[in-house]
C-alpha cells in the first residue's frame, strides 16, 4: 500500500544537460522545450506526457487534478500547476513569443530582450524579461507581477505593473468587461518555485541578485 501511494504521488525531477540553453534542436529550425519536472497526469496534445517528449510551438499542454509540469525553452521557463491548459505559440522566427493560457495556474520566468505575450480569454499580458504568475478562471484573473515590468491589457484599458518582489491583483470580469481590480496577497506560488525555474535556465531571481 505504501509503495502504491508513493508511486501515485511520485514526482520526477530531471536535470537537463542543456539547462540554460535555448532548447532541443529538431530537424530544421524548430525548437523543442526541455521538460525539467513532471508529476501526476499531464497531457501533451491529449497524449500522456513522458519526460522525454518534446514540447513544440503549437502544442497544447494540459495538467489534471494532480498534474504538474515544468519546462524551459529559448531562455524562458514555465511551471503549470494542476488543472491548467496552455497552448504554446511562436513568432515567424521560430521562437516562442505567445502563450495562450486557457485555464488554470501558470508561473513563468522570461529572459530579457524580445517581447512576449500571455493571452487569456479576457486579457493580454505584455512581457519583457520578468516573472509572473496567473490563475485564470471564467470570471476573474489573479495576476502577480513577481518582478520586472509587464502590461495588462483588457479591451481599451491598459495597466502597467512593476515590482521587485510580488505585486498581485485580482481582476474581475463581467461579460468580458473589466469590472474591478483589487490588491491581493501572494497566493499559490512562492519564491522557491521561482528560484527553481530561474535555475533551470541558468539565472537567479531578481530578488536574489
What are these model-derived regions, one by one?
Residues 1-9, 19-23:
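N-terminal secretory signal peptides
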Amino acid at each position: 500500500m505504501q509503495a502504491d501511494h508513493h508511486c501515485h504521488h511520485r514526482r520526477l525531477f530531471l536535470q537537463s544537460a542543456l539547462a540554460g540553453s535555448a532548447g532541443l534542436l529538431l530537424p530544421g529550425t524548430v525548437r523543442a522545450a526541455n521538460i525539467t519536472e513532471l508529476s501526476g497526469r499531464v497531457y501533451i496534445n491529449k497524449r500522456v506526457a513522458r519526460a522525454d517528449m518534446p514540447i513544440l510551438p503549437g502544442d497544447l499542454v494540459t495538467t489534471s487534478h494532480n498534474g504538474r509540469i515544468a519546462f524551459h525553452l529559448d531562455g524562458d521557463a514555465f511551471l503549470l500547476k494542476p488543472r491548467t491548459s496552455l497552448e504554446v505559440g511562436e513568432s515567424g522566427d521560430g521562437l516562442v513569443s505567445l502563450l495562450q493560457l486557457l485555464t488554470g495556474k501558470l508561473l513563468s520566468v522570461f529572459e530579457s530582450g524580445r517581447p512576449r505575450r500571455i493571452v487569456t480569454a479576457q486579457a493580454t499580458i505584455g512581457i519583457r524579461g520578468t516573472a509572473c504568475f496567473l490563475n485564470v478562471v471564467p470570471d476573474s484573473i489573479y495576476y502577480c507581477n513577481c518582478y520586472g515590468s509587464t502590461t495588462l491589457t483588457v479591451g481599451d484599458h491598459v495597466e502597467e505593473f512593476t515590482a521587485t518582489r510580488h505585486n498581485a491583483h485580482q481582476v474581475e470580469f463581467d461579460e468580458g468587461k473589466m469590472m474591478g481590480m483589487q490588491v491581493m496577497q501572494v497566493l499559490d506560488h512562492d519564491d522557491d518555485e521561482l528560484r527553481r525555474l530561474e535555475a533551470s535556465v541558468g539565472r537567479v531571481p531578481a530578488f536574489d541578485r
